[in-house]
């Protein structure tokens, strides 16, 4: 394995730290055929960006290549323009109804309360004591609904995450399909409730002026927003806390970084949870010197592309002068992340809360990573949370 760029995504060594494997893949084969996956694997930034942006050739909707897709899986993430355009516009319009100031205030209060509660002589697990509950509350408030039952929702959400690796482990597929159906039922209940406000209510109203969007498509798409908003945010928050515990100087007032937005952008690039995104080729063509045929699956390793030295100087470190907006952590083109603003808000608020409350983070044990390849995330992050001092200064 050390001499061959081939890698097995669920190998414990890869799960613990995939980036050395990504680097060898990128250096040896920016685009290559992975026999076990039965797909092309893309590790370079240029080719990855091309795949994500070209929906005419590389489809998210596998039905365009004649492959059946379960009805419960059809949502805005699995559609391409022009079918994708209507549901995305509907959701973007609904986003404008989210009260941003109230959202920011709520998030700040929640983070501050949890960090203060965790400051003790004993280490705390910041995955379950902070990142997961904060992210669930944030996406629920963003949608304008009460947070679902944490234990049940966590079980369904995790089943969906694990099913994303069903191409590597088929035993994970069935539980994921069941979980998607259950969460779609939850969202359908929200849509049927006349008392709902905010994003969900705005999405329901918008559907009445877009009759081509079915109730099932809207429910499935909101389920995807709920799930992605929770899992992506919570996993990124966990990874950000780990990096900040290892490098507390990142929040130093004398840092060369030009404010919280630059740091947030770099953490998405370096520590974004979404490792890979798949497409299917619907028209023969060339990609990175390889001939890609109709029906071939193409997997873009976003985490590899985001550390491509051809685009990012010192690609494995936080860059004090980042080239913002070039990473693929939020996708590209038609399928760029709807929740990018919420992710950035959570990161900026985390920075402020740590600085304003004089909180220091000290690792108190070895972090543990989940055995999932498509979405990377911590299962445990033991940290000593200490309140060192208080200051009123914070980034704007």
Q: Which residues does each PLM region occupy?
A:
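Cytochrome P450
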Residues: 1-396
């Amino acid at each position: 394995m050390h001499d061959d760029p081939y890698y097995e995504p669920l190998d414990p060594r890869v799960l613990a730290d995939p980036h050395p494997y990504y680097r060898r893949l990128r250096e040896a084969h920016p685009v290559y055929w992975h026999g076990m996956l039965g797909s092309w694997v893309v590790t370079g930034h240029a080719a990855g960006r091309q795949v994500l942006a070209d929906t005419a050739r590389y489809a998210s909707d596998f039905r365009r290549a004649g492959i059946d897709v379960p009805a419960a899986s059809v949502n805005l993430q699995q559609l391409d323009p022009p079918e994708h355009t209507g549901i995305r516009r509907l959701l973007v319009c609904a986003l404008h109804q989210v009260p941003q100031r109230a959202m920011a205030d709520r998030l700040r209060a929640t983070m501050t309360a949890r960090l203060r509660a965790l400051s003790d002589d004993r280490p705390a697990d910041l995955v379950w004591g902070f990142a997961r509950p904060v992210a669930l509350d944030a996406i629920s408030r963003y949608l304008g609904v009460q947070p679902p039952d944490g234990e049940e929702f966590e079980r369904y959400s995790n089943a969906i995450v694990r099913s994303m690796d069903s191409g590597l482990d088929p035993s994970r597929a069935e539980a994921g399909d069941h979980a998607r159906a259950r969460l779609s039922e939850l969202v359908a209940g929200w849509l049927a409730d006349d008392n709902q406000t905010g994003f969900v209510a705005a999405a329901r109203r918008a559907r009445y002026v877009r009759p081509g969007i079915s109730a099932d498509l809207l429910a499935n798409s909101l389920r995807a927003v709920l799930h992605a908003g929770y899992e992506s945010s919570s996993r990124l928050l966990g990874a950000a806390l780990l990096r900040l515990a290892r490098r507390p100087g990142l929040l130093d007032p004398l840092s060369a970084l030009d404010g919280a937005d630059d740091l947030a952008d770099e953490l998405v690039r370096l520590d974004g949870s979404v490792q890979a995104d798949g497409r299917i080729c619907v028209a023969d063509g060339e990609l990175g010197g390889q001939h890609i045929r109709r029906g071939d699956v193409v997997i873009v390793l976003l985490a590899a592309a985001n550390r491509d030295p051809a685009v990012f100087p010192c690609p494995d470190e936080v860059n004090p002068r980042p080239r913002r907006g070039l990473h693929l952590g939020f996708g590209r083109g038609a399928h760029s992340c709807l929740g990018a603003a919420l992710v950035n808000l959570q990161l900026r608020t985390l920075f402020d809360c740590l600085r304003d409350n004089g909180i220091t983070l000290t690792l108190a044990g070895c972090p543990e990573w989940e055995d999932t390849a498509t979405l990377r995330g911590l299962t445990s992050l033991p940290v000593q949370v200490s309140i060192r001092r208080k200051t009123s200064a914070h980034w704007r």
